[in-house]
Amino acid sequence: MAQQEKKEKIIYVVTHGADDPERAILPFMHANGALAMDVEAVVVLLGGAVMLARKGFMNHVFAGGLPPLKKLMEDFLAQGGRLLLCTPCIQFRQIGESELLEQAKPIAAAIFTEEVLSANAVLNY
């Protein structure tokens, strides 16, 4: 029996939200490109970027010349991209899980570390 080849995986770490819309939008553009190439794409939101996972928040993030964040995030999730959130970051901002997008998954540091160690590349925005 032939050994199944492991799928390539890229993690996009996002640390900016509405404070820097371009840096919030670009990782989702790149992650969508990875998914189109059949590469597993995982976006991890840290710090203030966790706000991007609040229901409706993405509707208000725009950067000149780039597609709207709302469309990029919807496409990312529809293609099977995974959206992970820093649990302490959402707790610090007093964001309840009911306020988050359904597909957003809060994670602890150990899970984040496992994801990073299993990836072919980790990009930070």
Outline where the language-model segments fall.
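Short, glycine-rich nucleotide/cofactor-binding loops
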Residues: 12-25, 57
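Histidine-anchored nucleotide/phosphate-binding helix
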Residues: 24-38
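Anion (oxyanion) recognition and catalysis
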Residues: 35, 77, 116-117
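Short internal beta-strands
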Residues: 41-47, 83-87
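N-terminal beta-loop-helix "entrance" segment that forms/cooperates
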Residues: 49-63
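Short, flexible loop segments at the rims of nucleotide/cofactor-binding pockets, characterized by
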Residues: 59-64, 99-103
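A glycine-rich helix N-cap at a beta->alpha junction
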Residues: 60-87
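C-terminal structural segments of small proteins and small subunits
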Residues: 92-118, 123
